[in-house]
UniProtKB/Swiss-Prot annotation:
Name of the gene: Calhm5
Function: May assemble to form large pore channels with gating and ion conductance likely regulated by membrane lipids.
Disulfide pattern: 41-127, 43-158, 142-149
Primary localization class, coarse: membrane
Assembly notes: Oligomerizes to form undecameric cone-shaped channels.
Keyword flag Acyltransferase: no
Subcellular location(s) per record: Membrane
Extracellular side: 38-45, 130-174
Entry keyword set: Disulfide bond, Ion channel, Ion transport, Membrane, Transmembrane, Transmembrane helix, Transport
Name of this chain's protein: Calcium homeostasis modulator protein 5
Positions bound to a 1,2-diacyl-sn-glycero-3-phosphate: 32, 37, 121, 202
Ribonucleoprotein as UniProt keyword: no
Transmembrane segments: 16-37, 46-70, 100-129, 175-200
Amino acid sequence: MDAFQSILKFFLNQKTAIGYSFMALLTVGSERLFSLVAFKCPCSVENTAYGLVFLFAPAWVLLILGFFLNNKAWRLFTGCCMNPKKIFPRRRCCRFFYVLGHIILSSLVAPVMWLSVALLNGTFYECAMSGTRSTRLLEMICKGKPKECWEELHKVSCGKSSMAAMESEEVRLSLQAQSQILGWCLICSASFLSLLTTCYARCRSKVSYLQLSFWKTYAQREKEQLENKLLECANKLSERNLKCFFENKKPDPFPMPSFGAWEAASELHSFHQDREHYSTLHKVVDDGMEQTPQEEETTMILVGTAQSL
């Protein structure tokens, strides 16, 4: 039992890495499925459009899904049309762009994975480049090749070119090599950017490493208990209302947070150095509806916590 609990604790502690690993495997599987089942290069002048659509359209869809599934985005934008001060509060206009940048970076993970895998495979890029009409690109691809390469490059990816089989294969391998080089460049650039943003966020942190660890633990526990409490209160309220409806009697008072409390607890957390609140809910409970001076607050985002609800 102790061994099982240790293993379970390890996986819970590494759930972010496990989640990204699962996303990577899912991306690889999806790309292979697209390549084998759905992708059929037309071997015509439409190669470029067809290849680029298969390369970038899934990445765009994944980006949109990333926004849809990011609870922090909905927490930021819910009610903003009715009250623009929610996203552009007084003296903290930059806060919106800071949070939005974090949301965009989080949503870019899946699209970058797709583009990296697709470029490393090379199928979509090969089809797209074989349909190019750019003189500069044709000079680069068909350098040292017969004139058939210029005229029938769009047929190379299907093996229908009148060029010698060896020369046609050389062109295909060259296009695949270019695709893989771009794929590795994208992976290296994304990894370096991720490292830079993480280092910058840690260097700008207003709390120590141990306090940050405590903050993460607290926020995770609050998230779990909040979900349970919401379900429990919803069950009790619905049970009370149904019972009173069918028994035709007046309901007993049911204590619930006020509208203002719901609004305050739904805001993104702003860390205050003098008053250590580890979440917006923590701040609302301690201060009630009293607002902390805006100019003394520092926006800090804790990834994967109750702030993502």
